[in-house]
Design a protein with these regions (language model features):
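Single conserved hydrophobic/aromatic residue that forms the stacking wall/gate
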Residues: 1-7, 11
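Transmembrane beta-strands of outer-membrane beta-barrel pores
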Residues: 28-34, 57-59, 73-81, 108-114, ...
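Outer-membrane beta-barrel translocator domains and adjoining extracellular loop/strand segments
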Residues: 8, 36-42, 82-88, 116-125, ...
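Flexible, solvent-exposed coil segments and beta strand-coil junctions
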Residues: 30-37, 69-75, 116-121, 147-153, ...
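Residues that define the transmembrane beta-barrel architecture of outer-membrane proteins
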Residues: 9, 47-51, 86-90, 133-137, ...
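Residues on the lipid-exposed face of transmembrane beta-strands in outer-membrane beta-barrel proteins
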Residues: 13-17, 53-57, 92-96, 139-143, ...
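Repeated loop/turn-to-beta-strand initiation elements of outer-membrane beta-barrel proteins
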Residues: 20-26, 62-66, 100-106, 147-153, ...
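Extracellular loop and loop/strand-boundary signature of outer-membrane beta-barrel proteins
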Residues: 38-43, 78-79, 123-127, 156-159, ...
């Protein structure tokens, strides 16, 4: 922890990792309203408290068709100004490695109703509003990484009652014709609906009208990447 007469921040983390099959962690952190966010080297709001816990079960010894597997559950909570709950998320992640070195996994999370206070930093007359419950379920699969040609797929769907459904999909091809050279081609599509996005505040005489709107962000991306290692000290990327 670090503190001074002007501002203070606290961060604690405690955990245990069993060498064979399980591990757990707990963390708690806080910034007061005088904490200088520039002290961290990047933009992060102050006057915030967060905590969470994680529990993971893993198997690293081969059995049957499996070389290894893992199951992790995690809980995150954040509180903002006046101890308002601004994040309440529960997530689950799994992965499995097969004997043919293909691997696959599942990831799922649910954001339970909390509050969003980000708009009051833009305008003092904006609202702190209640967020809706949102869930996301996804899966991924990746072929043998020892091969010259590696295929991977990542996809998922999220949903909330008011904002509706969103989708994510990604397909990637990695090709390694020779050891120093790696080529990668990635196709990605992301459809993300947003709810209660702040627009503006209109003053009409003595009346204040707060304008919010739904929106939907669609991202289509194709990316080609090249990595060529000439020596341990010289690499070309493009």
């Amino acid at each position: 922890p670090r503190s001074s007469s002007a501002a203070s921040d606290v961060y604690k983390r405690q955990g245990y990792k069993n060498a064979t099959w399980w591990e757990s962690r707990f963390w708690l952190g806080s910034y007061d309203d005088k904490f200088d966010i520039n002290d961290l080297g990047y933009l992060r709001r102050n006057d915030m408290t967060w905590s969470g816990m994680m529990f993971k079960i893993r198997r690293l010894e081969p059995i049957g068709y499996l070389l290894g597997s893992s199951f992790e559950i995690k809980l995150n909570k954040k509180w903002g100004i006046d101890d308002i709950l601004i994040e309440d998320e529960l997530s689950i992640e799994t992965w499995t490695l097969l004997k043919n070195y293909w691997r696959f996994g599942l990831n799922s999370f649910i954001k339970r109703p909390a509050y969003n206070d980000e708009d009051i930093f833009r305008d003092d007359n904006a609202w702190v509003y209640e967020t809706e419950k949102f869930w996301y379920n996804g899966f991924w699969i990746k072929s043998d990484r020892r091969r010259k040609l590696i295929l991977s797929i990542d996809a998922g769907m999220g949903n909330a009652e008011l904002r509706g459904k969103g989708y994510y999909s990604e397909f990637e091809i990695d090709y390694k014709p020779i050891d120093p050279l790696n080529l990668s081609l990635e196709f990605k599509r992301d459809i993300s609906p947003n709810y209660m996005q702040y627009v503006d505040i209109i003053e009409d005489g003595s009346e204040i009208v707060r304008v919010y709107a739904n929106s939907k962000q669609t991202t289509d991306q194709i990316q080609l990447r090249l990595d060529w290692t000439f020596s341990p000290d010289l690499t070309f990327q493009g």
